[in-house]
Amino acid sequence: MAKTKPVKVLFHSRGADQETAWCVPLAKRNLYRLDNILFLHATPTFGDVIEAKENAEGMLTCKRVVKPGGRFAMIVDYPRPEDFKVLVKLLRSHGVETEGMSKGRLYLAVPKALPAKDVFQLAAARVPG
């Protein structure tokens, strides 16, 4: 079976803080699975199923979360560029999805079974600062 090609979907807060992210179309019309971590919004989160429809300009736009994917958003800051790969490997080994946008900051989609406190402790034990 061929893999469905991701599409860009627009996310915003009442018109502000606009950003786009990759989403995978699902079988049911207007439903997509978020395949990125958003930088400007805590929700929706990686893996959530969302409803998206075209806006007046023809851009797919998120309308609502249909089914949560079981993750929450977090940010972990780190002091040195070489810490990025170390943290990504460590956190992914615990089921955490990661994305970097700017130096020193890692955006996370953490499984709800892993408490935020544990994520910070894991990171602090491996990376100084």
Model-derived features: where do they sit?
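Short beta-strand/loop turn elements enriched in aromatics
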Residues: 1-28
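Short, structured beta-strand/loop micro-motifs enriched in basic residues and often containing a Trp
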Residues: 26-36
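Short, Lys/Arg- and Gly-enriched loop/turn segments at beta-strand edges
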Residues: 56-67
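Short glycine-/aliphatic-rich beta-strand segments at the starts of folded cytosolic domains
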Residues: 66-80, 105-108
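Helix-rich terminal scaffold detector
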Residues: 81-129
